[in-house]
Every structure is written in structure tokens, then in C-alpha cells.
A protein has these predicted regions:
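Acidic interaction surfaces
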Residues: 1-82
């Protein structure tokens, strides 16, 4: 799908690339990840836990950030390039 592994990966990348809050959060996840945590793991954790997770646990199209169909390697590559 448009060069991405599948719809879920494409959709997550699309939302991160086109929403200012998600974009800035993703950039922060690259900088502030902990230990061996990947940027994508940090982003998913930030988006799924606490108050944010209650409201932003999925893209605007309903794809959950922790959807196992999302290709983590592709998402990490995209996040490193932000």
C-alpha cells in the first residue's frame, strides 16, 4: 500500500506525518526513549497509556497504535527520519 507493508502501517505513518501533535510526539519519542527502547515502542507506549491513551489510542481512522499488523521496523525507520 503506497510503498508500506500494509494498510495499518501506512495509516499510522500517514497520521503521524500529517498531524502536528502526533508528529511532535513522535519526534520526542526518538529523543526521549529509554534504554534499548525503540522510537516506535516509545511512541506506542506514550499513545496507549494514561490520559492520552483514553483519547488517542488509535488513528483518526480507527487503527490502534498497538495493532500487531503495524510493521514496527518500517515505523522505526520512518521515526528516525523525522
Amino acid at each position: 500500500m503506497n510503498g508500506w507493508a500494509n494498510y495499518e502501517t501506512w495509516n499510522a505513518a500517514l497520521w503521524i506525518g500529517n498531524d502536528e501533535f502526533l508528529y511532535n510526539t513522535a519526534k520526542a519519542c526518538v529523543t526521549y526513549r529509554e534504554g534499548l527502547e525503540t522510537p516506535w515502542d516509545k511512541f506506542v507506549r506514550c499513545m496507549m497509556e494514561g490520559e492520552i491513551g483514553a483519547f488517542l489510542g488509535a488513528t483518526g481512522d480507527g487503527v490502534r497504535w498497538d495493532d500487531p499488523a503495524i510493521d514496527a521496523d518500517e515505523m522505526n525507520e520512518m521515526l528516525w527520519d523525522l
